[in-house]
């Protein structure tokens, strides 16, 4: 009799994906973040589902329904803060996961990488719409400012913005549709994540050396299941520490004031994980130019496989490229800091220089470093 694990139509798929999957024997802790993202997604869907049971997507009651969840629903406060801070953990894992792909050359798996870029855009859209739902001051003004950017598109811009709003300003119709999209998108993300895994398992995982490891593979279970469980426990520990000790630390105080179109907050800014893109947007004086820079700051990731010039896949043995990579990380941290600062000297010029450096690193300096390293190999 054959093992049910290998013969059952459904269990067979799980077996090939998580149990008998041949995995490189030398993948480091940086490879843990894919499974952590899966855990984050499950956590967000579950907490979001319970929040949706008590939330009302209406401009008059949205803010008070969130207050009701925190005050009167059994353990509502922990569900709400797990969901809000879970989004931050999601993005931390996402940025590290992408950084690892960039460092070790995983972007050469074209299909997997492109699905990953689509996943990033979908997760960003979901997080943005989720931030609007509590209907605080920053929710309302954030929605107004970001959706208004589309009006920079020539000819159809204004019509497009009013179509998204469902009226002539951010109002009840906008909140209702944002709630509907925020509810459905995580399920689309789940489908995309499965596709992402499907394409990954077509080629097998990359490893730190970037060298094909077909002659040295080990089964995923028990080696990497144990390793993933350790990562999951550390993730849960970090998230619970954040939720139980400082749940508001990553939020904005302005969002605890109910939304009013009559007065604007002194500094409109998105959640911390969008600040780097927001800084790039603000660093261009022209509106359309800013919107294009904002879009390109994310879409440029799709160009990275084309810009790979090195004969080696991974940066493990490429010190010059490593310097460029860490310069990019430092630049993104600088942009994140600038995005949260007011628009005044010296922050304007720092933001502009950091934005120029961001695009220069990806489009010019990193490919150039690859070419230089290729020539050094000939010596």
Curated annotation (Swiss-Prot):
Question: What are the GO MF terms of this UniProt record?
Answer: metal ion binding; ubiquinol-cytochrome-c reductase activity
Gene3D superfamilies per UniProt: Cytochrome Bc1 Complex, Chain C
Question: Where found, per UniProt?
Answer: Mitochondrion inner membrane
Q: Does the keyword Lipid metabolism apply?
A: no
Annotated a ubiquinone binding lies at 201
Can you list the GO cellular component terms from the UniProt entry? Answer: mitochondrial inner membrane; respiratory chain complex III
Kindly state a single biological-process term from the GO annotations of this entry: mitochondrial electron transport, ubiquinol to cytochrome c
* Main location group: mitochondrion
Task: Please indicate if the UniProt record lists Cytoplasm as a keyword.
Answer: no
Query: Where does the sequence pass through the membrane?
Result: 33-53, 77-98, 113-133, 178-198, 226-246, 288-308, 320-340, 347-367
UniProt keyword annotations, A-Z: Electron transport, Heme, Iron, Membrane, Metal-binding, Mitochondrion, Mitochondrion inner membrane, Respiratory chain, Transmembrane, Transmembrane helix, Transport, Ubiquinone
Q: How does it assemble?
A: The cytochrome bc1 complex contains 11 subunits: 3 respiratory subunits (MT-CYB, CYC1 and UQCRFS1), 2 core proteins (UQCRC1 and UQCRC2) and 6 low-molecular weight proteins (UQCRH/QCR6, UQCRB/QCR7, UQCRQ/QCR8, UQCR10/QCR9, UQCR11/QCR10 and a cleavage product of UQCRFS1). This cytochrome bc1 complex then forms a dimer.
Q: Which family does it belong to?
A: Belongs to the cytochrome b family.
Further details from the record: Heme 1 (or BL or b562) is low-potential and absorbs at about 562 nm, and heme 2 (or BH or b566) is high-potential and absorbs at about 566 nm.
Record-given protein name: Cytochrome b
The organism of origin for this protein:
Diceros bicornis (Black rhinoceros)
Lineage of the native species? Eukaryota, Metazoa, Chordata, Craniata, Vertebrata
The gene it comes from is MT-CYB
């Amino acid at each position: 009799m054959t093992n049910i694990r290998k013969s059952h139509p459904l269990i067979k798929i799980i077996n090939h994906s998580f149990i008998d999957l041949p995995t490189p024997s030398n993948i480091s802790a940086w490879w843990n973040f894919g499974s952590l993202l899966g855990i984050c997604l499950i956590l967000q869907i579950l907490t979001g589902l319970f929040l949706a049971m008590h939330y009302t997507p209406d401009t008059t009651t949205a803010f008070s329904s969130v207050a009701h969840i925190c005050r009167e629903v059994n353990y509502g406060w922990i569900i709400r803060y797990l969901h809000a801070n879970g989004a931050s953990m999601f993005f931390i894992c996402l940025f590290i996961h992408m950084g690892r792909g960039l460092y070790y050359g995983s972007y050469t798996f074209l299909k997997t990488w492109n699905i990953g870029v689509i996943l990033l855009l979908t997760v960003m859209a979901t997080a943005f719409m989720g931030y609007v739902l509590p209907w605080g001051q920053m929710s309302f003004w954030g929605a107004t400012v970001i959706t208004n950017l589309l009006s920079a598109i020539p000819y159809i811009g204004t019509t497009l913005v009013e179509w998204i709003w469902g009226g002539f300003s951010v109002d009840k119709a906008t909140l209702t549709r944002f709630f509907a999209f925020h509810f459905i998108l995580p399920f689309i993300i789940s489908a995309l994540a499965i596709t992402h895994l499907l394409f990954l398992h077509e080629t097998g995982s990359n490893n730190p050396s970037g060298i094909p490891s077909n002659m040295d593979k080990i089964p995923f279970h028990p080696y990497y299941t144990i390793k993933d469980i350790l990562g999951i426990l550390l993730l849960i520990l970090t998230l619970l520490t954040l939720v139980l000790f400082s749940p508001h630390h990553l939020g904005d105080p302005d969002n605890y004031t109910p939304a009013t179109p009559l007065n604007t907050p002194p500094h409109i800014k998105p959640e911390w994980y969008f600040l780097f893109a927001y800084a790039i947007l603000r660093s261009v004086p022209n509106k359309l130019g800013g919107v294009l820079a904002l879009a390109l700051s994310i879409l440029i990731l799709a160009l990275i496989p084309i810009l790979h010039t090195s004969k080696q896949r991974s940066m493990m043995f490429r010190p010059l490229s490593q310097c460029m990579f860490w310069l990019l990380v430092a630049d993104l941290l600088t942009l994140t800091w600038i995005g949260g600062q007011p628009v005044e000297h010296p922050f304007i010029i720092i933001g502009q220089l950091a934005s120029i450096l961001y695009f220069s690193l990806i489009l010019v300096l990193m490919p150039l470093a690859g070419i230089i390293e290729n020539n050094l190999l000939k010596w």
